[in-house]
């Protein structure tokens, strides 16, 4: 018998996790296996609608729209570079009520009350406390994982590592062409706190 994705069940799960209106919520997800399981290509869209409704316009919803091509010398276009972090993140980028934060490596698609504030953050280092990660920490944000093991997606650990200057990582600079929301091209530098090679 074909299983059907239950929107009500998803809402119940959010209830049980304490996800509510006005929350500041970061959602990491992998919906591919769920789409296969339920044979439902519209599943990311259904989930997105429920999450938007849940946090409401007075809350703030963030999806990771990370892309590491800038680290390999490729151009970064704020409006057109795709996310490498899944269908739900890429779907959010297509919605005109979401905006994208500035960092070319660890950007976020953002909806809600504080989206402009977060999108305007200028953080040279991907994991610094003046990044969207820091915003979530300062504002008691929550992190929801959908069909992901936290060991594969808990990027916040790198924020803690940078904050305490762990000895096994260092700041590595990346330089490349950056195309901003006004289509202005410039050469920009960004840093990522990367693991030292053995």
What is the meaning of each model-derived region?
Residues 1-198:
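N-terminal and secondary-structure boundary signal
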């Amino acid at each position: 018998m074909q299983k059907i994705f239950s929107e009500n069940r998803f809402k119940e799960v959010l209830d049980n996790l304490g996800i509510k209106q006005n929350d500041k919520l970061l959602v990491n997800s992998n919906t591919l296996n769920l789409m296969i399981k339920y044979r439902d290509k519209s599943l990311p869209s259904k989930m997105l609608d429920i999450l938007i409704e849940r946090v409401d316009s007075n809350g703030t919803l963030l999806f990771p729209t990370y892309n590491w091509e800038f680290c390999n010398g490729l151009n970064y276009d704020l409006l057109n570079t795709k996310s490498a972090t899944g269908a739900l993140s890429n779907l959010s980028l297509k919605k005109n009520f979401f905006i994208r934060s500035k960092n070319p490596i660890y950007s976020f698609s953002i909806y809600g009350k504080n989206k402009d504030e977060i999108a305007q953050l200028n953080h040279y280092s991907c994991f610094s406390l003046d990044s969207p990660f820091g915003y979530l920490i300062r504002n008691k944000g929550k992190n929801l994982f959908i069909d992901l093991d936290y060991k594969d997606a808990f990027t916040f650990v790198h924020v803690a590592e940078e904050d305490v200057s762990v000895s096994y990582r260092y700041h590595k600079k990346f330089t490349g062409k950056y195309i901003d929301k006004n289509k202005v091209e410039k050469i920009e530098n960004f840093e990522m706190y990367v693991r030292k090679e053995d």
